[in-house]
A protein has these predicted regions:
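Metal-cofactor-binding active-site regions of metalloenzymes
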Residues: 8-13, 42-43, 67, 73-80
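Aromatic-lined carbohydrate-binding surfaces of glycoside hydrolases
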Residues: 11-23
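Helix-loop segments that flank and shape redox-cofactor active sites
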Residues: 145
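Histidine-acidic metal/acid-base catalytic patches
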Residues: 2-8, 17, 43-53, 59-65, ...
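Residues that cap or delimit alpha-helices
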Residues: 60, 71-79, 83, 200
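Generic preference for hydrophobic/aromatic residues in regular secondary structure cores
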Residues: 35-38, 82, 245
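Flexible glycine-/small-residue-enriched beta->alpha junction loops
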Residues: 21-51
Length: 303
């Protein structure tokens, strides 16, 4: 990668499952569709489709009753849609992974504890980062999405403490973060502005999108400027980080993308042409909104 002048490498340490959603076509009031995660649907998959051993022990009795009622209400087609929605989040392919293959790999992954996985990440960083530093490459780990355990699989890049752990495991300018406001923002416990302020010099890549969190633990991917993520405060903190870098004579450019977007207008007619979440029109709209927000904040801070 370095030989081809790729200086920022985004990667993740999510086992088996990449980003996980239970509905890839959640209808919004404006007619667009978005990605949604519902813990009720996820638990139904976990217990009744994946049939993870002792899965019920991870949920309380009241919630288990709700899951049972929910699953019984699903038609055969709806069960199939739920399964496909979850298995679509497998890394490295646009094809659905076979459920039996998923079950086999899932059992292997469950044998790795959270502590062991963190040890593995620290080992990886200590082996990779010194070489990356020599080559001038910035490694930018992406947060877990969603930022909590799913189907019993541990998550280790999901909150402030875990980000601090991996940065402290191998202190280096090349050991850094992809700041994803959507992934981290799915948890109300994550203070996104504090993460930027405290780890700003280690942010090498930025993914900006919003999520709307609901009281039942579900969330959907909202419009970029509307939702539970205070995007104006996040953008202000990012611009302030760039100003700090400029004052120190450091590189201030941070690659940014609008991340996922809604399915809008003509994109509704060609959903087979793009990966879920990566619509052209929805992401272009998000980029325009974020660029305008950045411009306004930058002008107000520098004027």
């Amino acid at each position: 990668l370095a030989k081809n002048d790729i200086k920022v490498v985004c990667y993740n340490f999510m086992q088996l499952i990449d980003w996980t959603r239970t509905n890839l076509d959640y209808k919004l009031p404006n007619g667009a569709s978005a990605l949604k995660y519902d813990p009720l649907a996820a638990a139904a998959f976990d217990i009744y489709i994946l049939k993870r051993e002792n899965a019920e022990k991870d949920y309380n009795d009241e919630f288990l009753q709700e899951v049972s009622t929910f699953f019984k209400s699903l038609s055969t087609a709806e069960v199939s849609k739920l399964e496909k929605s979850i298995l679509a989040g497998m890394p490295g392919s646009r094809k659905l992974i076979d459920l039996e293959e998923f079950k086999k790999n899932h059992k292997t992954v469950l044998a790795i504890s959270k502590n062991k996985l963190q040890d593995n990440l620290a080992y990886f960083l200590k082996a990779i980062i010194p070489e990356a530093e020599k080559l001038g490459v910035k490694m930018a780990i992406h947060p877990d999405d969603p930022p909590f355990s799913v189907f019993g699989v541990p998550r280790i890049v999901s909150n402030y403490e875990e980000l601090k752990f991996l940065l402290d495991a191998c202190p280096s300018p090349s050991n850094g973060l992809t700041f994803c406001s959507g992934s981290l923002g799915a948890s109300s416990e994550n203070d996104l502005v504090k993460i930027i302020n405290d780890f700003g010099d280690k942010i090498h890549f930025i993914h900006l999108r919003n999520v709307q969190r609901n009281e039942n633990g579900s969330f959907y991917e909202a419009e970029h400027l509307k939702g539970s993520v205070p995007m104006e405060k996040v953008m202000k903190a990012i611009v302030e980080e760039q100003i700090k870098r400029n004052q120190k004579g450091e590189i201030v450019n941070i690659p940014m993308r609008p991340d996922h977007g809604h399915v809008l207008l003509d994109d509704m007619n060609r959903q087979d042409d793009f990966y879920s979440g990566y619509s052209l029109i929805g992401r272009a709209l998000g980029l325009a909104q974020l660029s305008g927000l950045e411009m306004g904040i930058r002008e107000s801070l520098l004027s």
